[in-house]
Amino acid sequence: ISLEKYEIEEITYSRIVDESDFQSENLQVSVKSGLTEDKKYGKVTLEAKFFDKEKNKKVSARISGYYTINVEEDSENYIAINGTAILYPYLRSAISMISTLDSQDAVLIPTINVLSILENQEEWRIFVMYYLQR
């Protein structure tokens, strides 16, 4: 697959005042992926929420990547796994850059095991999109 472009759809950075804002996990990542009907193009959307209890920071972001697909077999899984692996560093970088505008302490979200994230995500479904806006 080849990444054609990516778009940051939403990014939020805030200082946390209330303890109830903190989640049990520091990092939550969700993935959605889809293909055009002809399976030549794909889209992956990553959403991440990161909570830094020590520094009272919360960052959330949603980013989408648009891909050209050049494999024919198992393209649904291919776009979900490889598309996520390609896009995730862009998400990490955007979160880090936004957090450095506030202080010298950049928020660095950890790397992930893509297969583990996809296996553990209950609502994750591969779906075919009949129209993919490019």
Mark where each language-model region is.
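N-terminal intrinsically disordered, cationic/polar leader segments
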Residues: 1-86, 93-134
